[in-house]
Amino acid sequence: MALSREEVAARYGTALFGYAQDNKVLDTVYDEMMALKKAAIANPKFISVLSDPILSSKDKKSILTAVEKDFSDEVQGFLNLLLEYNRFADLIDIIDQFSLLYDNENKIASGTATTAVKLDDDQLERLSESFAKKYDLNAVRLENKVDPSILGGVILQVKDRVIDGSVKNKLKKIRAQIIDEN
């Protein structure tokens, strides 16, 4: 029975996480995997070439050798394992699973800050720090989405929490309160 993409990602991501943790190179492996993900997204042919069933294993290995030379032994070994077991097509999903485990281990959360206008880096950083402190997290990675319809304020979405501090929501509450009073 073939494994689903999610099952493959869970198994390989968990294995990489455990291996990196056991060898005390978790931060290094995390940084390298994030760099690899960024490069793979910027150049999608990288994954498709290393996943191509027509290309010989020798050719794939030579391509991978050129790419992996700047990575740690742990990441090189992992990439060779993916190549050996024909799992390169699942690379991004595996990295995402690994990243999720890393974030959980380090009390890091990711989320979205929706605002009427784009926040600068300093504002986004202060918002992240404030949320992290309030919810006892080490860090919060926020992506800023712009939605002029919220009029002002911010809507924070991190994990299963939503904090709606938008002007649109406040006006909606005031309106509901006025209607209820009548």
From Swiss-Prot:
Activity regulation (UniProt): Increases 2-fold following exposure to low pH.
Presence of the UniProt keyword Magnesium in the record: no
Database matches in InterPro entries: ATP_synth_OSCP/delta_N_sf, ATPase_OSCP/dsu
Coiled coil: none
Protein's cellular compartments: Cell membrane
Any one Gene Ontology molecular-function term assigned to this protein's record: proton-transporting ATP synthase activity, rotational mechanism
Record's bilayer topology term: Peripheral membrane protein
Induction: By low pH.
Keywords: ATP synthesis, Cell membrane, CF(1), Hydrogen ion transport, Ion transport, Membrane, Transport
GO cellular component: plasma membrane; proton-transporting ATP synthase complex
NCBIfam families: ATP_synt_delta, PRK05758.2-4
Purpose of the protein: F(1)F(0) ATP synthase produces ATP from ADP in the presence of a proton or sodium gradient. F-type ATPases consist of two structural domains, F(1) containing the extramembraneous catalytic core and F(0) containing the membrane proton channel, linked together by a central stalk and a peripheral stalk. During catalysis, ATP synthesis in the catalytic domain of F(1) is coupled via a rotary mechanism of the central stalk subunits to proton translocation.
Family to which this protein belongs: Belongs to the ATPase delta chain family.
Summary of subunit composition and partner proteins: F-type ATPases have 2 components, F(1) - the catalytic core - and F(0) - the membrane proton channel. F(1) has five subunits: alpha(3), beta(3), gamma(1), delta(1), epsilon(1). F(0) has three main subunits: a(1), b(2) and c(10-14). The alpha and beta chains form an alternating ring which encloses part of the gamma chain. F(1) is attached to F(0) by a central stalk formed by the gamma and epsilon chains, while a peripheral stalk is formed by the delta and b chains.
Protein name (database record): ATP synthase subunit delta
Gene: atpH
